[in-house]
């Protein structure tokens, strides 16, 4: 994976969920855009539905990219904190992503726990024939990360590392503060 500046460690030792604010998201998407820009502007930004949509659009705006696409991949069985996961990610309507042949693509999600959803989706995108696929996430939850590997071994751009559940400002639980 590409070398990126060290992600910010906020929330690394926090007890309970980490509630990110819209300001946090603005800073994180700016950081991810800067990391991405260091290796060149992508031709398309693909957001993983649902959580990756908002950061994908913000990053695309910061990079001046107009080609923003989506791919619906699910693994978490509900929106509850520490919700159960299915063994493998499920892709719904894979044709919705369109033709990526020869494009430089940035694939964006909000969170990587084990990294399985992002890795599975990145491989599916690579199978569509783009020239390059880079990955970016707002946060990595190291509490769920596989032992013996580092997030930067599998993810190109990371804004934040934590060891707790992350609640984003667009999620229902966020308003229950």
Each PLM stretch: what is its role?
Residues 1-41:
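Active-site-facing substrate-recognition patch
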Residues 29, 65-105, 116-120:
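Short, glycine/charge-rich flexible loops or terminal/linker lids adjacent to PRPP-binding catalytic cores
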Residues 70, 107, 135-137:
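Structural beta-sheet core signal
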Residues 2-12, 123-177:
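PRPP-dependent phosphoribosyltransferase catalytic core
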């Amino acid at each position: 994976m590409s070398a990126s500046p060290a992600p910010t460690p906020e929330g690394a030792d926090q007890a309970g969920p980490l509630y990110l604010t819209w300001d946090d998201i603005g800073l994180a998407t700016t950081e991810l855009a800067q990391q991405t820009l260091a290796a060149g502007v992508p031709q398309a930004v693909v957001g993983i539905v649902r959580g990756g949509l908002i950061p994908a659009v913000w990053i695309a705006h910061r990079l001046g990219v107009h080609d923003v696409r989506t791919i619906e991949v699910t693994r978490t069985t509900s929106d509850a904190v520490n919700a159960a996961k299915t063994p493998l990610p499920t892709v719904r309507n894979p044709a919705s992503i369109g033709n990526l042949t020869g494009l430089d693509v940035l694939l964006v999600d909000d969170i990587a726990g084990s990294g399985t959803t992002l890795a599975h989706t990145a491989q599916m995108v690579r199978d569509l024939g783009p020239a390059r696929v880079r990955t970016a996430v707002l946060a990595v939850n190291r509490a769920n990360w596989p032992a013996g590997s580092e997030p930067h071994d599998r993810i190109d751009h990371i804004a934040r590392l934590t060891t707790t559940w992350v609640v984003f400002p667009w999620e229902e639980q966020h308003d229950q503060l």
